[in-house]
């Protein structure tokens, strides 16, 4: 028997390595398809992207309850790539997210959000829409469509496979038929929900009698709206008279309610909201840079009083129960009414209380 040379030993070793690698690849390949490995390519056209981006979803793999899913829910039944430009503050981006989800489903398209929207919403909610990589966004042949703030027939028949929406949609007419899905998307992470409920428990224990409480979340929008509404839109924000009437509405219908006040103007609230009945609690921190604590608190209440703005809308929409809102808060000739339809903004069952427009008449006097 001839002794093996050093060269023969090297060749034999390489052959064993190659065969082992092939065997391993075949094993993984078979196992992956046996368990239904899903592949969703985010690239609309491989020729447009140097490095294709892919998301791998293992069906049945449990997700952490406090993280957002990176995978589409039904990638096989949807096509195309739709997204929306994230613009505005917290409530604006919630409206954009919900509208994108609803319109994409209506048109059988796959929805993706951009990283900025994910950064704004994912720390607060268990959102599930996948994130579109920046390099894919920059190479996609988008058609752009600016939405107005109510559902229109043409939005139900959009044939564009690659569509980037924009605007400030926040109307129930887009997504109310998916209310339970929207509520699921905007489920708070556990630590935020538990913190909010802890605040409400302390309010309950602070009462001199031991019985279940009815909590009414109150959101008072102030801040930049104090200038924007009268100067640009010929409108007003909610005043103390409105808040008193709204609270009396709940006092007449619910036994001993507790009003949980949040605002980006807490100092004004403490100075102007009547607390003589002992049922008003100033619980908000008013931090506009981190609004999720106030938002979580409002959603854990039973009912809502809102003034104006998308933040209050979403708090009321997610809380459920009764909602009282500020109605007719602009003059009839306001330009705001060209971009805002009250009947599309407020649910039909919500209760509107007319705003006091007398400060605007004073401003209009020569």
Curated annotation (Swiss-Prot):
Coarse class of the primary localization is Golgi
Provide one Gene Ontology cellular component: Golgi cisterna membrane
Q: What are the GO MF terms of this UniProt record?
A: alpha-(1,2)-fucosyltransferase activity; galactoside 2-alpha-L-fucosyltransferase activity
The record ties this protein, via Pfam families, to: Glyco_transf_11
Q: Where in the cell is it found?
A: Golgi apparatus, Golgi stack membrane
Q: What is its EC number?
A: 2.4.1.69, 2.4.1.344
List the keywords (alphabetical).
Glycoprotein, Glycosyltransferase, Golgi apparatus, Lipid metabolism, Membrane, Signal-anchor, Transferase, Transmembrane, Transmembrane helix
Output the InterPro entries linked to this UniProt entry.
Answer: Glyco_trans_11 (IPR002516)
- Pathway membership: Protein modification; protein glycosylation
Protein name (Swiss-Prot/TrEMBL): Galactoside alpha-(1,2)-fucosyltransferase 1
Q: Which gene encodes it?
A: FUT1
């Amino acid at each position: 028997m001839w002794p093996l040379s050093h060269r023969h030993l090297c060749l034999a070793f390489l052959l064993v390595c190659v065969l082992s690698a092939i065997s391993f690849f075949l094993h993984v390949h078979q196992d992956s398809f046996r368990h239904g490995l899903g592949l969703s390519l985010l690239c609309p056209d491989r020729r447009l992207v140097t490095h294709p981006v892919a998301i791998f979803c293992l069906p049945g793999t449990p997700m952490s309850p406090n993280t957002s899913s990176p995978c589409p829910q039904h990638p096989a039944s949807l096509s195309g790539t739709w997204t929306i430009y994230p613009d505005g503050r917290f409530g604006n981006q919630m409206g954009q997210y919900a509208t994108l989800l609803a319109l994409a489903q209506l048109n059988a398209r796959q929805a993706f959000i951009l990283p900025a929207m994910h950064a704004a919403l994912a720390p607060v909610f268990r959102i599930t829409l996948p994130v579109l990589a920046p390099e894919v966004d920059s190479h996609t042949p988008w058609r752009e469509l600016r939405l107005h703030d109510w559902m229109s027939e043409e939005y139900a028949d959009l044939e564009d496979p690659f569509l980037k929406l924009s605007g400030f949609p926040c109307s129930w007419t887009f997504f109310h038929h998916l209310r339970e899905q929207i509520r699921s998307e905007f489920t708070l992470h556990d630590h935020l929900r538990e913190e909010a409920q802890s605040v409400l428990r302390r309010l309950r224990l602070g009462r001199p009698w031991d019985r279940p409480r009815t909590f009414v979340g109150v959101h008072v929008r102030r801040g930049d709206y104090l200038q924007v509404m009268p100067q640009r839109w010929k409108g007003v924000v909610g005043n103390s008279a409105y808040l008193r009437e709204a609270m009396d509405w709940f006092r007449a219908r619910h036994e001993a309610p507790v009003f949980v006040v949040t605002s980006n103007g807490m100092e004004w609230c403490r100075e102007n909201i009547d607390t003589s009945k002992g049922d008003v609690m100033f619980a908000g921190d008013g931090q506009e840079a981190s609004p999720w604590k106030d938002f979580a608190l409002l959603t854990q209440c039973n009912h809502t009083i809102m003034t104006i703005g998308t933040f209050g809308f979403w708090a009321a929409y997610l809380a459920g129960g009764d909602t009282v809102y500020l109605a007719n808060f602009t003059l009839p000739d306001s330009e705001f009414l060209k971009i805002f339809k009250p009947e599309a903004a407020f649910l039909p069952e919500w209760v509107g209380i007319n705003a006091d427009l007398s400060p605007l008449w004073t401003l209009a006097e020569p």
